[in-house]
Amino acid sequence: MPIDHSGTTTNGGLVLSATGSQWRQSARSLLGQLYLMFVSMLLLVVVPGTSAADDRWHPGIYVKIEDWQLRSPAQMETIYEELRNTPQLRGIKVILLWGRYESRDSRGGASRYDFSQLDEILARLGALENKHLIVALAWREFKSAKGASEILPNDLQGGRAWNADPNRAHTQYEYLWAYRMSNQPGKYAYNLKLWHPTILGRLDAFLAALAAHIDQHPNLTQISTTESAIGEPVTSFVEEGGSAQRQYDGQLAVIRAMKKYFVQSDVVPDFNYSREHVAAMVPILQAEGIGLGSSNSNKSKGLILQPPSGAPGVLTYYPRLSGTVILAPEIQGDDYRSTYGHDTPPDHPRYESIYLRVRDELKANYTVMQRNNPYWLGDASTPSMLKFIQSYPAIVNDRTGAGGLNHVKPKSVR
């Protein structure tokens, strides 16, 4: 059930009596109350770790939960058991498919929100020691299987058929409110049309409802997004009714809505491409107290490029922003496979080098590790990342719980 914010607080007042002793007693009581209020305010300013915002500052190592894992009770039980047995893991990151949590009756037109899945996750994390949740809104998805998607609510899923794809049977319909980015079998992809007022208005209402329901929960630490790359639309942006710049503007509108509604939790969106878009966003992140996340931390050319002119890669901003905004580079399958990204030969870097890059070169406060095999659990020829986390001295011996990452709050954290 949504948290009830309708309660009110009353302040007790002094009732002056006719006698001087009662008046003096009341005066002393008032002075005592004022003194306690002053001391409390002073503690909030000068004593580290005493502000309410600290309840949401939980830097460290998190695990990314794939949607197929989220939909499997057996998989989730395994993940909770890993969290229970691994103090070095700070929590999990869950990707929010908008259509799973909002639906509409076409006859009435009113949105219904069902956040029971998140309620269950937060309850399970709350029952564990020092475990927290990051939620990430999916404005982009990749599809390899047939069938409908939950990237959009049910009433926004219908649309005109687009017949140029010879493998069109991969999905039951086309999306009127999402544009396609690929025709390659196994690599179908969609982005929400964030330039459209209908989508932005509905997302604004969804985020308001989501925040009202979970933002006060002490085990929620962040809200994020999927990556900023917008891809190349199969049909041109002009045909679709938008433009690349308007799509990027829509991303910023969604991020600002998160910042508006999630007043307790930190906002750390995911940026990778375009480099020009990232360059335009960095000053805004600094000015508005928004963090910087990235879905990969490898040395792919596009991520680390520092041209003599033009926009640099997103990972070049991390060291210079350390101490200013929250930094959250992630470790995904591409990072396990190759030092230099998905389009280079695999060299399977040592887990220590992957971790040290995130910690020392990128100055991370948070990192999210993809829980994909064989890397996570290991096999006959692949070591286990989970066992690395459970045994690496710099992670195990960090008393702050941050897994060796930078646990000092940046200026942007309230």
What are these regions (language model features)?
Residues 124-126, 183-224, 250, 254-257:
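An active-site-proximal structural segment forming one wall of the substrate-binding cleft
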Residues 219-230, 254-277, 295:
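Aromatic-lined carbohydrate-recognition surfaces of secreted/lumenal glycan-active proteins
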Residues 296-414:
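Substrate-binding cleft of secreted/luminal carbohydrate-active enzymes
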